């Protein structure tokens, strides 16, 4: 699952623990851990990934993909 690496990278950029991200996304810790381990999401639970994505985007994370299909994340930092 491509999301797993992006979620781990985004969390690292923010300096968040799995517990912090799970809380901000409104998910159980075990659910987030399963997704980060690349064990996938249960059928019909794509909404779980959307919750994670929204929590990360609200913190300034952008999910990116280039025209070669490579994926990644970047973080927007406000200038002072």
Predicted regions and their residues:
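Helix-turn-helix/homeodomain-like alpha-helical modules used for DNA recognition
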Residues: 61-80
């Amino acid at each position: 699952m491509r999301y797993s690496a992006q979620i781990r990278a985004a969390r690292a950029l923010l300096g968040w623990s799995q517990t912090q991200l799970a809380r901000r996304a409104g998910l159980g810790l075990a659910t987030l851990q399963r997704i980060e381990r690349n064990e996938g999401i249960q059928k019909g639970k794509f909404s779980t990934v959307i919750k994670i994505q929204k929590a990360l985007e609200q913190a300034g994370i952008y999910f990116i993909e280039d025209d070669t299909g490579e994926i990644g994340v970047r973080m927007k930092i406000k200038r002072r």
